[in-house]
Amino acid sequence: MTSPDSLANYYFDENEADKVIDFFSECLTHSTGQWRGKPFELLEWQIKYLRELFGWRRSDNGKRRYRQSALFISRKQGKTELAAAIALYCLHCENEPAAQCFNVAADTDQAALCFNAAKAMTENEIELSTRSEIYK
C-alpha cells in the first residue's frame, strides 16, 4: 500500500497545465499600473508555479492534487494580479458547480485590492463579464 502522498497516487496532466497558461494569455488583461489593459503575459516563474499547481492530478478522481497554495515573494512582483487571475480561473474554468474561491488578507483594504483586480479583469473581458455578476 502506498502512502497518501506517494507520487504513485498522482499524475501530471499536460493538458490541464497548458489550459491554465492559455487562460491567462487569452482571457485576461492586467488591471492596474503600466500594464493596465494589456494581455496578462506570464513570467517564467509564474508559468512554472501555475503548471505545478494545476497540472498535478489525483489518480483516484482526476481532481487537482493541491487545494491550497502559499506564495511568498517580495513587494511589487504582481502577487495581487496573480491571485486575482487564479481565482478567476478557478471560478470559470474548473467546471465546479457553485465554485468558491477565497482571498485571505490581513485586513479588508488588502483583500479589496485582490477583489478589485479580479473585478477589473472580469469587466475587461466580454466572455468573463457575461458569465459573471459582480455585487460590489
What are these regions (language model features)?
Residues M1-K136:
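Phosphate/NTP-binding elements of NTP-utilizing enzymes
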